[in-house]
Structures are given as structure tokens and as C-alpha cells.
């Protein structure tokens, strides 16, 4: 198996996302080609299905038209974000995540670029993931530069207004001595990459004295249980003995 970003990062990421509940949509299949809105990369059928389930009396196409209109505003996506959260229509069920439709695809092009992985929630491409080959010297650094140039390009305005978060990963653990290694996230219009890393490593091992105390308590509980069982056995034996004596007395 070749050692590259596809085998070491992209495929493992897709497999992990599948375990989380994302359905994979192939984009290179002529038979099952997704019904895409070419201006936004919104999955029209998925959006309609999810919208009509969450809003049985509303029209999905009217909502889609409103979304597309807001995505063209020069407001860095603010209007679309407000519609996503505060619309009279329910675009995403934030209270019951299982009511939403989760899908993913790989290498779905938009204008002049092509994210490695795109995540859809109710048909909306809200998350993009860029993967880099592990131990590549300029991998994440180059992606920071590309990300900045990408959102500065006017032809990507709609796509950047729609995307809520970008993820970048080389599938390597955090290393404080290697600032460009690991997993990062960023907003569409931000050149700042934030790390995914544990803020604190917690030592949850109790001190020796506490361990001894816990062991003693467990032993005491076991002893009490054994004593109770012995008492119950004795009571049962006593009852059986009394029954035998009664039977013997009646027989004689």
C-alpha cells in the first residue's frame, strides 16, 4: 500500500466518520450521481428530504432559494449563519441530532479547488476537511497559505459563506515541539489555525492510601455478603428441618 495522504489520512478519516454515522456519497458514479446545486454544492435531494421532515407544512424550495440569496451577500456569511440558527424554518435540529441527515463525500470540486472531504448536514456542505501526508515538511504550512488565498478569491465567496468550519489533519499526535503537526480547525474567513489538543492531562490514579482504603471497603462488603448468604442458608436448613419433623410427627 502506498504511503500518502490518501492511504494514511483520508481513508482512515472517512472510515472514522462512517462509524460516527456519516453516509458516503460517491461523486464519480454515473448511476448514483448526487443531485447537486452547482452554485453552492448543496445536495438538493438531501436538503429537501431533511427540510420536509423537520417542516412538514413548509416548502423546501422556497427555503433553498432564500439560502442561496443570503449566500451571495457580502457579509462574510453572517446572514446565512443567522438563517441557519434563527429562521422560522428548522434547517437543522440542534436539540435532537438524530433527526438530522449526515453525509460525506471525497474530492467534490467547487470552482477552482476541491476539498479532500466534505461533510453535509441535511444536504448543506458545512464542513470541509483537508488532509496532508504525515511527516511532510510543509504540509500544514502550505495549507495555511492556500486557505488564506482561497477565501480572498471572489469566486469562492458563496462557498466560504456557507462553510462553517475547516479541518486540517496529517493524522499525527500533538507535539508541542512541532507546531505544524497534528489536527487543526479554522473558520472560513480566518487564517488562524486552532489545535485539537487536551488542555490538561489529568492524573486520575488515586494515591496509595486511598487505594488501600478502597480495597478494604471492597473486602468488607464481600465479607458482609458472605455472612448474609450463610445466614440465609442456615435459615433455609432450619425451615427444612422443621418441615421434616412435622411430617414425621404427623406420620406417627
For the regions a protein language model found, what residue spans apply to each?
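An alpha-helical interface "stripe"
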Residues: 1-216, 247-252
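Long, intrinsically disordered low-complexity tandem-repeat segments
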Residues: 214-239
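Ala/Thr-enriched low-complexity intrinsically disordered regions
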Residues: 238-241, 251
Amino acid at each position: 500500500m502506498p504511503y500518502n495522504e490518501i492511504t494514511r489520512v483520508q481513508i482512515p478519516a472517512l472510515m472514522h466518520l462512517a462509524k460516527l454515522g456519516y453516509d458516503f456519497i460517491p461523486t464519480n458514479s454515473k448511476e448514483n450521481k448526487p443531485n447537486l446545486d452547482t452554485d453552492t454544492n448543496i445536495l438538493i435531494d438531501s436538503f429537501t428530504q431533511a427540510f420536509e421532515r423537520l417542516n412538514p407544512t413548509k416548502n423546501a424550495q422556497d427555503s433553498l432559494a432564500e439560502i442561496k440569496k443570503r449566500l451571495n451577500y457580502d457579509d462574510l456569511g453572517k446572514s446565512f449563519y443567522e438563517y441557519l440558527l434563527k429562521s422560522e424554518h428548522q434547517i437543522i435540529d440542534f436539540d435532537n441530532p438524530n433527526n438530522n441527515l449526515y453525509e460525506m463525500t471525497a474530492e467534490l470540486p467547487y470552482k477552482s479547488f476541491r476539498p479532500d472531504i466534505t461533510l453535509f448536514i441535511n444536504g448543506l456542505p458545512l464542513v470541509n476537511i483537508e488532509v496532508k501526508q504525515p511527516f511532510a515538511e510543509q504540509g500544514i504550512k502550505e495549507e495555511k497559505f492556500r486557505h488564506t488565498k482561497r477565501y480572498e478569491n471572489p469566486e469562492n465567496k458563496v462557498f466560504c459563506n456557507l462553510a462553517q468550519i475547516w479541518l486540517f489533519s496529517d493524522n499525527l499526535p500533538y507535539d508541542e515541539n512541532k507546531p505544524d503537526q497534528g489536527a487543526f480547525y479554522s473558520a472560513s474567513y480566518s487564517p488562524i489555525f486552532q489545535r485539537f489538543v487536551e488542555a490538561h492531562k489529568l492524573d486520575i490514579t488515586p494515591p496509595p492510601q486511598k487505594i488501600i482504603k478502597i480495597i478494604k471497603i471492597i473486602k468488607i462488603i464481600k465479607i458482609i455478603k458472605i455472612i448474609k448468604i450463610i445466614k440465609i442458608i442456615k435459615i433455609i436448613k432450619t425451615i427444612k428441618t422443621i418441615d421434616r419433623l412435622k411430617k414425621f410427627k404427623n406420620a406417627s
